[in-house]
Design a protein with these regions (language model features):
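Asp-box/BNR beta-propeller blade signature and adjacent active/binding-site loops
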Residues: 1-217
Length: 217
């Protein structure tokens, strides 16, 4: 991690955060930062969460997320978390175990991240998932869809992550499966901005694309 205290004019040196995951940490209602991820470049490669109580200056291991029976936790990747309206914390996990390979799994914590349920599939093929709690209280997940239609999709939950809607198509015009990792923010007017990377058919380089969209539900 690197930090800036002057609006991005200058940056600190890099320092470790214990776990790694592309979508980074979230801030909880109690002010803590929670980072769900994986201990990369270690022999154990634990999957779990660490926390910071000083705005990300230092990090401490909090809890391991248990593996589903028969799963190799080393095949869990690229986690992301969100705090739901009922106070639970949800984590989405990119699963590469043979059972439900390529699907997003979900684990929950009801005690602020100190302990976790066993990950379970939620019926969503696509990864990795980015979670966002909307101003309406609903949860939104956005994820790359690396088979036709190639692009990015979203799903909503209005019961704090217990069930998820049918997919909403954000983009479906990709040249192939080399795309995704969407991140989404809710703007002041309630609209959504989603950004992702995508490789083009006639170019050796990838590009960043964006979609400005609104929910109709």
């Amino acid at each position: 991690m690197i930090r800036s205290t002057d609006g991005g004019v200058s940056w600190s040196a890099r320092y470790p955060t214990i776990v790694n995951s592309p979508h980074g940490p979230i801030q909880l209602a109690d002010g803590r930062l929670l980072y769900a991820g994986k201990e990369l470049w270690t022999k154990a490669q634990r999957v779990g969460v660490c926390e910071s109580r000083d705005d990300g200056q230092t990090w401490h291991w909090l809890a391991e997320i248990p593996a589903r029976s028969g799963d190799d936790p080393k095949q869990y990747h690229e986690l992301h978390a969100a705090e739901s309206g009922d106070g639970r914390i949800l984590v989405h996990i990119r699963n590469h175990n043979k059972a439900n390979e390529g699907e997003t799994h979900q684990a929950e914590s009801a005690d602020g991240g100190k302990s976790w349920s066993t990950p379970h599939p939620i019926g969503v093929w696509g990864l990795p998932s980015f979670l966002l709690r909307l101003s309406s209280g609903k949860l939104l997940m956005t994820y790359g869809h690396r088979r036709p239609p190639f692009g990015n999709q979203a799903r909503l939950s209005d019961d704090h992550g217990r069930t998820w809607s049918e997919p909403l198509i954000i983009s479906g015009d990709g040249a192939g499966g080399d795309l995704g990792y969407p991140s989404t923010v809710e703007l002041a007017d309630g609209s959504l901005l989603t950004v992702w990377y995508e490789s083009l058919e006639a170019s050796p380089r990838a590009v960043l694309r964006q979609a400005h969209w609104r929910l109709s539900v």
